[in-house]
């Protein structure tokens, strides 16, 4: 059996009860934290809290050389962990399909994701979001500015009146995390100076949610990572009220969105 378990967003307690039970019953536990990580828990914290040993895999060890994971899963109960949800954004469908091809039973125990948390924290309605994008560090995509794939997706969403979640690049092996202020500065240069919402530490006891024009967000300090940005499309009146109450959105910026 190969069980995919989402750990949620914040610490060793963010996992669901079903996930915790499956984790503690596993004979072997593997995890990856190269695409996301828990804001307030180390691997050691997870191991201590759940009385387990975790084999942390790099990207190559998951995507190119998962044979030992699959071999173990043919005769043992194996758990595979990620922050958030293993099948949303950080998708491991390929690993699941490889297991199924070998006749291995699989299941998924879901965790809270950054996108659902961002919707809840901002008050923006979940069904009004379009395609999400990831904004890389400039050095990571080998060119100046924002990749056209990012700006094109944002523009396409806005044409349809949809909101965009902008995930921010993570280089966990280098302890580098793109911050909302730096991302806002990059986007303000390549896009119009539009309304945006910075969300920091979603899932924690002290998340930060602030709405303003991109140039204003670029001047703010949102504290420790992880951060993301939301670029709103057309706003329902309840969404406007939520952004004003939950994210201190300036009234003139909400009016500007209405007039687009």
Swiss-Prot record:
GO terms for molecular function: diphthine synthase activity. It is an enzyme of class 2 (transferase). It comes from the Archaea. Keywords: Methyltransferase, S-adenosyl-L-methionine, Transferase. The keyword Aminoacyl-tRNA synthetase does not apply. Disulfide bonds: none annotated. Its EC number is 2.1.1.98. S-adenosyl-L-methionine-dependent methyltransferase that catalyzes the trimethylation of the amino group of the modified target histidine residue in translation elongation factor 2 (EF-2), to form an intermediate called diphthine. The three successive methylation reactions represent the second step of diphthamide biosynthesis. Belongs to the diphthine synthase family. PANTHER family: DIPHTHINE METHYL ESTER SYNTHASE, DIPHTHINE SYNTHASE. This is Diphthine synthase. It comes from Haloquadratum walsbyi (strain DSM 16790 / HBSQ001). The gene is dphB.
């Amino acid at each position: 059996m190969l069980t995919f378990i989402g750990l949620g967003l914040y610490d060793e307690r963010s996992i669901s009860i079903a996930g915790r039970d499956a984790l503690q019953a596993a004979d072997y536990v593997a995890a990856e934290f190269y695409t996301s990580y828990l804001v307030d828990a180390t691997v050691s914290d997870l191991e201590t809290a759940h009385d387990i040993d975790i084999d942390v895999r790099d990207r190559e060890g998951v995507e190119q050389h998962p044979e030992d994971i699959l071999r173990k899963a043919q005769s043992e109960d194996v758990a595979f962990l990620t922050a958030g949800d293993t099948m949303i954004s950080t998708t491991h469908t390929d690993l699941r399909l490889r297991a199924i091809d070998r006749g291995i039973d699989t299941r998924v125990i879901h965790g809270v994701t950054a996108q659902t948390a961002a919707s809840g924290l901002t008050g923006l309605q979940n069904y009004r979001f379009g395609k999400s994008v990831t904004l890389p560090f400039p050095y990571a995509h080998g060119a100046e500015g924002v990749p056209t794939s990012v700006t094109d997706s944002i523009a396409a969403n806005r044409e349809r009146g949809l909101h965009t979640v902008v995930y921010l690049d993570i280089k966990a092996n280098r302890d580098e995390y793109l911050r909302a202020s730096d991302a806002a500065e990059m986007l303000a240069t390549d896009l119009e100076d539009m309304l945006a919402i910075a969300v920091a530490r979603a899932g924690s006891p002290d998340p930060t949610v602030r709405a303003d024009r991109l140039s204003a967000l670029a001047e703010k300090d949102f504290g420790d990572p992880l951060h993301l940005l939301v670029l709103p499309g057309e706003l329902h009146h309840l969404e406007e009220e939520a952004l004003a109450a939950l994210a201190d959105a300036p009234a003139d910026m909400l009016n500007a969105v209405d007039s687009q």
